[in-house]
Amino acid sequence: MERRARRPRGRFYAFRRGRWNHLKRLRRRYKFRHRRRQRYRRRAFRKAFHNPRPGTYSVRLPNPQSTMTIRFQGVIFLTEGLILPKNSTAGGYADHMYGARVAKISVNLKEFLLASMNLTYVSKLGGPIAGELIADGSKSEAAENWPNCCVPLDNNVPSATPSAWWRWALMMMQPTDSCRFFNHPKQMTLQDMGRMFGGWHLFRHIETRFQLLATKNEGSFSPVASLLSQGEYLTRRDDVKYSSDHQNRWRKGGQPMTGGIAYATGKMRPDEQQYPAMPPDPPIITSTTAQGTQVRCMNSTQAWWSWDTYMSFATLTALGAQWSFPPGQRSVSRRSFNHHKARGAGDPKGQRWHTLVPLGTETITDSYMGAPASELDTNFFTLYVAQGTNKSQQYKFGTATYALKEPVMKSDSWAVVRVQSVWQLGNRQRPYPWDVNWANSTMYWGTQP
């Protein structure tokens, strides 16, 4: 039975599992006065359409022997996409490629670590470089070891999608590791992250705060809508690179409130989350007689598209997303920011412990660090962002679009996000070397006693 103690001003304390827990108790006269108003609050109305936190249940897991708190603080720039020079694109279709101002920020420890890593050519775009590197082209010896000297293998493959938010972020991490840059000059893999933490495990995600501000004015009406969702609740799929085997990779289309109700292996009908970027194959006409006006038909292999899909501005607004107006459409103040706060584990399964390094493996390799062996890339929350406009394509559902630009020595950001995140690592190993086992087992080579 837990001990309870009363404190002044209506505070309530309970001693449970080795610590004092503070619970807020509203005064009696306050509760009954505002009981009728709480039923029709704005937040309760929005939760009827989309509940950002479906809830968790507590699991009786032991507290760690020792803990270490990790804090992240930084800024994320949501920029417009770029395209390679037009003379290097196949067929000259670069003049007809458009992108949408959408983004998706996943809250997981892996991407937060990538956001605080070295700012190099393949891991980040822009920003200061932590150290003096050689960047004189691919003819030097450093091109084989330093990532900022490498050139893309194929100039037709996109380097990143808006889901890789950590590429355009500058994040500080506390506590810092002064030897991380020299040990890992390139982008860290799951194997390197597991070795950096050693025997620590991810005990819980404490809190993450987002403050989003629209920075680009697009016409007379261009607010930025942002919605925070728990886990992978509304994620259609993650970003993948283009490959010739795209037809054999299955796609999940059964997310709530989007129109997708089944599983498909290829051509799905576009809804408010997927724009018709992959046109269907034209019908095969066997007759040689001219039928009407001759037009140029393109099949699915002659068009460029992306599997990475996002929520449109209209969908986010219908789910109760917040709006942030850019400067010029509204005076800049604290209310100009969209504030989002994510607390707790955010895992509907209720588990608190997460594996950083798989147990029972002596040598850590990439195969062991892949899901579900390692949970560094477990998404606790997801922030969906889209900018609206009064003039947009019909299948974009009010989302602002733009023509892809060639790479220039500056980036054009349409939103800025301030981030603060707190994580806690735990150690389950007993730190007492004088403990003994109740029974010892011995084994001889070749025989079993």
From Swiss-Prot:
<comment type="subunit">
    <text>Homomultimer (Potential). Interacts with Rep; this interaction relocates Rep into the nucleus.</text>
</comment>
<keyword id="KW-0945">Host-virus interaction</keyword>
<dbReference type="InterPro" id="IPR007291">
    <property type="entry name" value="Capsid_protein"/>
</dbReference>
<keyword id="KW-0426">Late protein</keyword>
<dbReference type="GO" id="GO:0003677">
    <property type="term" value="F:DNA binding"/>
</dbReference>
<dbReference type="GO" id="GO:0019062">
    <property type="term" value="P:virion attachment to host cell"/>
</dbReference>
<keyword id="KW-1048">Host nucleus</keyword>
<dbReference type="Pfam" id="PF04162">
    <property type="entry name" value="Gyro_capsid"/>
</dbReference>
<keyword id="KW-0238">DNA-binding</keyword>
<keyword id="KW-1164">Virus endocytosis by host</keyword>
<keyword id="KW-1160">Virus entry into host cell</keyword>
<feature type="region of interest" description="Nuclear localization signals">
    <location>
        <begin position="6"/>
        <end position="47"/>
    </location>
</feature>
<comment type="similarity">
    <text>Belongs to the gyrovirus capsid protein family.</text>
</comment>
<dbReference type="GO" id="GO:0039615">
    <property type="term" value="C:T=1 icosahedral viral capsid"/>
</dbReference>
<dbReference type="GO" id="GO:0043657">
    <property type="term" value="C:host cell"/>
</dbReference>
<keyword id="KW-1162">Viral penetration into host cytoplasm</keyword>
<dbReference type="GO" id="GO:0075732">
    <property type="term" value="P:viral penetration into host nucleus"/>
</dbReference>
<dbReference type="GO" id="GO:0042025">
    <property type="term" value="C:host cell nucleus"/>
</dbReference>
<keyword id="KW-0167">Capsid protein</keyword>
<dbReference type="GO" id="GO:0075509">
    <property type="term" value="P:endocytosis involved in viral entry into host cell"/>
</dbReference>
<comment type="function">
    <text>Self-assembles to form the virion icosahedral capsid with a T=1 symmetry. This very small capsid (25 nm in diameter) allows the virus to be very stable in the environment and resistant to some disinfectants, including detergents. Essential for the initial attachment to host receptors. After attachment, the virus is endocytosed and traffics to the nucleus. The capsid protein binds and transports the viral genome and Rep across the nuclear envelope.</text>
</comment>
<keyword id="KW-0946">Virion</keyword>
<keyword id="KW-1140">T=1 icosahedral capsid protein</keyword>
<keyword id="KW-1163">Viral penetration into host nucleus</keyword>
<protein>
    <recommendedName>
        <fullName>Capsid protein</fullName>
    </recommendedName>
</protein>
<keyword id="KW-1161">Viral attachment to host cell</keyword>
<feature type="region of interest" description="DNA-binding">
    <location>
        <begin position="1"/>
        <end position="43"/>
    </location>
</feature>
